[in-house]
Amino acid sequence: MLLEPGRGCCALAILLAIVDIQSGGCINITSSASQEGTRLNLICTVWHKKEEAEGFVVFLCKDRSGDCSPETSLKQLRLKRDPGIDGVGEISSQLMFTISQVTPLHSGTYQCCARSQKSGIRLQGHFFSILFTETGNYTVTGLKQRQHLEFSHNEGTLSSGFLQEKVWVMLVTSLVALQAL
């Protein structure tokens, strides 16, 4: 039997509020690029709560589809908790890898990743590619190009979908359970 119209809407509103609260606490990783003259900046941004920063390592790998780790990375950043930041729910930490002049050696597949040494959480960003062409130009595919360094939670290529999938599974399961009442 289906829920009464008023009860179903109320239950759905409560579930959506729960999902919104939980997804705001998720740790996400995004990848982006910006070009400044001949320089190309590859940027890995991790969104997290300030208390989650301790023990987190953000790293960028090239051509490492199966074994991207801090040990095999091009560059890594160890996050530290900033006690000076109060009242902030979610903050971002960025790792920037700068290529001064893109050459054929830079062609390849890149990936931003992060790992927590405390909680065992591992985030893997989407793969993106740099292709150096014969004319001396290059293209970056798989993410959005940026002309200047501005980041917001809604931009970039959202990648750590595991926690978001768990939230959606919880939402669907809850709706099915409510319909069974």
Curated annotation (Swiss-Prot):
Tissue: Expression is restricted to functional NK and cytotoxic T lymphocytes. Expressed in viral-specific effector memory and terminally differentiated effector memory CD8+ T cells. Expressed in memory and activated CD4+ T cell subsets (at protein level). Expressed at high levels in intraepithelial lymphocytes (at protein level). Expressed in both alpha-beta and gamma-delta CD8+ T cell subsets (at protein level). Expressed in umbilical vein endothelial cells (at protein level). Expressed in monocytes and at lower levels in B cells.
Keyword set, alphabetical order: Adaptive immunity, Angiogenesis, Cell membrane, Disulfide bond, Glycoprotein, GPI-anchor, Immunity, Immunoglobulin domain, Innate immunity, Lipoprotein, Membrane, Receptor, Secreted, Signal
Keyword Membrane in annotation: yes
Disulfide bonds: 44-112, 61-68
Recorded GO MF terms: activating MHC class I receptor activity; kinase binding; MHC class I protein complex binding; MHC class I receptor activity; MHC class Ib receptor activity; signaling receptor binding
Superkingdom of origin: Eukaryota
Residue positions assigned to the propeptide: 160-181
Keyword Glycoprotein part of the UniProt annotation: yes
Glycosites: 28, 137
Signal peptide feature range: 1-24
Entries under InterPro entries matching the protein: CD160 (IPR042385), Ig-like_dom_sf (IPR036179), Ig-like_fold (IPR013783)
A biological process from GO: phosphatidylinositol 3-kinase/protein kinase B signal transduction
Induction comment: Up-regulated on CD4+ T cells upon stimulation via T cell receptor plus costimulation via CD28. Up-regulated by IL15 on immunoregulatory NCAM1/CD56-bright NK cells.
Covalently lipidated residues, kind GPI-anchor amidated serine: 159
Protein name according to UniProt: CD160 antigen
Species this chain originates from: Homo sapiens
Gene it is expressed from: CD160
